[in-house]
Curated annotation (Swiss-Prot):
Coiled coil: none annotated. This is Probable dual-specificity RNA methyltransferase RlmN. It catalyses: adenosine(2503) in 23S rRNA + 2 reduced [2Fe-2S]-[ferredoxin] + 2 S-adenosyl-L-methionine = 2-methyladenosine(2503) in 23S rRNA + 5'-deoxyadenosine + L-methionine + 2 oxidized [2Fe-2S]-[ferredoxin] + S-adenosyl-L-homocysteine; adenosine(37) in tRNA + 2 reduced [2Fe-2S]-[ferredoxin] + 2 S-adenosyl-L-methionine = 2-methyladenosine(37) in tRNA + 5'-deoxyadenosine + L-methionine + 2 oxidized [2Fe-2S]-[ferredoxin] + S-adenosyl-L-homocysteine. Specifically methylates position 2 of adenine 2503 in 23S rRNA and position 2 of adenine 37 in tRNAs. Residues 114-351 form the Radical SAM core domain. Binds 1 [4Fe-4S] cluster. The cluster is coordinated with 3 cysteines and an exchangeable S-adenosyl-L-methionine. Keywords: 4Fe-4S, Cytoplasm, Disulfide bond, Iron, Iron-sulfur, Metal-binding, Methyltransferase, rRNA processing, S-adenosyl-L-methionine, Transferase, tRNA processing. Its main location: cytoplasm. NCBIfam families: rRNA_mod_RlmN (TIGR00048). The gene is rlmN. [4Fe-4S] cluster binds at residues 128, 132, 135. Pfam families: Radical_SAM (PF04055). The active site is at 108 (proton acceptor), 362 (s-methylcysteine intermediate).
Amino acid sequence: MAVSLPLVFTAPRRGMPPKHLADLDSAERREAVKELGLPGFRADQLARQYYARLEADPEKMTDLPAAVREQVGAALFPTLLTPVKHLACDGGDTRKTLWKANDGTLLESVLMRYPDRATLCISSQAGCGMACPFCATGQGGLQRNLSTAEIVDQVRAAAAALRDGDVHGGPGRLSNVVFMGMGEPLANYKRVVAAVRRITSPAPDGLGLSQRSVTVSTVGLAPAIRKLADEDLSVTLAVSLHTPDDELRDTLVPVNNRWSVAEVLDAARYYADKSGRRVSIEYALIRDVNDQPWRADLLGKKLRKALGPLVHVNLIPLNPTPGSEWDASPKPVEKEFVRRVLAQGVSCTVRDTRGQEIAAACGQLAAEN
């Protein structure tokens, strides 16, 4: 039985990692380079090495004078994440990486290859304070926020691994990034938004992915959703709703006690209107808990009323977690749920589940060494 944990919005005051180039915007980069006594053009040069060439080791930056590489490395390229181990499944198409941060904190990212794309699922916090009882990350509690650079470096490392053919399937290109790993992204708001800008800005300011290929998920921090809408980004917003009624959601997603289903959907509509993007509604289907036909009908009705055509439901067969008494709904129940949501005029599909065997699927990340 899952133990009821308190909600934690503010991360413990643990020391953040040393400053890294990826923490800095272009003006801050120039200032940092000037402080090292180097000419201003080195700022963009270093950024191109990191973002365009995916190089994080100044010793390998051949356009940088050998005499200053050590100094630059110490000041702007501290080692943030060290891989502890890689686990693969799905014929090698899914790879989970356990990372150790500078202070020993553990976190995970998951790279998934498909015939037409490669998607990286990244963490924004070590652990999570949202306390959802069916999620292994939420049951582990919150250790600390990740820095902007720790978030970005997960992406750079995956892009480099794909480019170099270090993952199954040969050389490839990273096409999508989803903030669906460990943590509640909007509880680490400032650093996550900065990371999104680094991931999507063209070189020398970032990795150059399209904003439309980035998804930011949330359990429903309504004020932060509105704030994100006002950033004028065109990333996809994914809301982990999991049930359409407040009574059950208060238990399944404890943050609902702070912001109700109606408030979350109002904020999601504001995001859809501002961004012009369809909102994704995530719904983990749990046997005999939230899979009843009436809940499917209510979900469809509420979403159609709140979001009209600007919504898509992703049904997720519940992934097993240690100690949980819950499991996935039977396939016929899942099929009927989809049919009923569609009957309300709302787009709905079942998500392709990857990584169950290596605890890399949605809700399974626990960063266990």
